[in-house]
Amino acid sequence: MFNPSEIEAMPLELEKLFRGLEERIMADVIRKLKANGQEITRATDWQLHRLHELGASKIEIKEKIKDALKLSDSELERIFSEVIKEGYARDESLYKLTGAEFIPFEDNKQLQQLIQAVKAQTAEQFQNITNSLGFAVRQPDGTLKFQPIADYYQKTLDKAMVDITSGAFDYNTVLKRTIKELTNSGMRTVDYASGWSNRVPVAIRRAVVTGFNQVVARVNEDNAEKLGTDTFEVSWHSGHRPSHWWGGQWFTRGQLISVCGLGEADGLCGCNCYHSYSPVVPGASVPTYSKEQLAQMEAEENKKIEYNGKEYTKYEALQRQRKLETRMRAQRQDIKLLQEGEANEDDIIGAKVKYRITSDEYVRFSEAMNLPQQRERVMVDGLKNIGQIPKDKILKNAIGDDIIIVNKTTLRGIPNSITQVVNAKGGIDRNYYGPNGRQFKQISNNDHNKPKQHPFGVNGEHAHDYTYDENGKLLRGRGRELSDSERQENGDIL
């Protein structure tokens, strides 16, 4: 779709990226048109608008839609007319085919600025836009050498970056697609020269967020140059790390480096930094926040909230929330691998229960800390409701605790869980597991057909306490009567 002057202005690597971008936008537009009864929705209109702004020809857009949907000229005109009639078209000329056929490259300031930003970000190589060091191995002389797999990883990230920076795709959609593409290839972790290793979702999110912010920073510096200013306002966001206290303030370009650490991994626009900076003109621009507002917001950030005996600032709470999300993503992958490996049913149910326990803790903690749940961070793997437990595999006891239905009793189980086994003659055993995953108690509603050994209760119902020696060897206690609370708790089976 690019015209010759645009192609000539782009290096080969960037041309490939933008051609791929156009193909993905067009494919997504066609998919949405098919899914919505050939109606151009607001989301589809936005994508077509961005496609044209990136240099696509109006006629070629029209022809591609017409061919893909097998429409006649009159049918296509009807679809286009509906958009104008609804009144939400961002550029009516796109559907009327009036005005310029395409935006000439020399007049396409947005495209020029995006290309210049990528050029600066990649030191004119137009590759590895996120500057990821994944799969880089440090050589004896101290230099870094990328493994062959790094090329595939970087190209996949580059696709994600142009999709997001173009404005045609939203962040979460691109993130989900990228993670799915990499995990489907068999990639599970990303390894770094430092010896650090991350699961794919964590590595992708960090690389894309960091890379995107750095490209935006390049655009903002270009804007500053055009405005003739050397002063910038750094954005402020809740939950920032303590060392990023400078959010919401004004700094010169030099101070962005000396004070805010611009260019450093742990500084402004570094790894996992959500701050950005925009040009301002002293004497004309007005700060977003007053000093008093910033002081009040920072005080709120440092206010501590207690949960389970521990106090958390906003940053500390967000860090724990991120850890719980990471744990849930890992647990979802474990479930997927168990299912693919056709593991036994108890193991799969056990993995799902672990996920459910973490998920419940995530809800409780988020509510206690007044933090919004960010389930999209967990569901980004595209595995949907993989952690859902079949209704016939979990029930409630008399006081509402979850009971997991399993096929056999094991001494090791899910920490802080209760399982239930039904024996061949219909008797029920409930197994209790402590914080370390060891079984510490069993409650039975029968005498195991050994009435002399279990002369308890009305029907032989009894309990066994489990203890362990210093080597972890089981010391199983003799049977005993149920306490009143145990009878109340298990009244549904007694």
Language model features: what each stretch is:
Residues 277, 455-468:
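Histidine-centered catalytic micro-motifs
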Residues 274, 429, 464:
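Conserved beta-strand and immediately adjacent loop positions that scaffold enzyme active sites
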Residues 1-268, 282-412, 416-436, 441-450:
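Domain-core detector
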Residues 273, 440, 446, 460-462:
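Intrinsically disordered, low-complexity regions enriched for glutamine and histidine
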Residues 463-494:
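Active-site or metal-binding loop neighborhoods of secreted/extracellular toxin and effector enzymes
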Residues 266-280, 460, 478-483:
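Short beta-strand-alpha-helix junction that forms the catalytic/metal-binding core
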Residues 280-285, 468-472:
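Short active-site loop/helix that positions an aromatic residue
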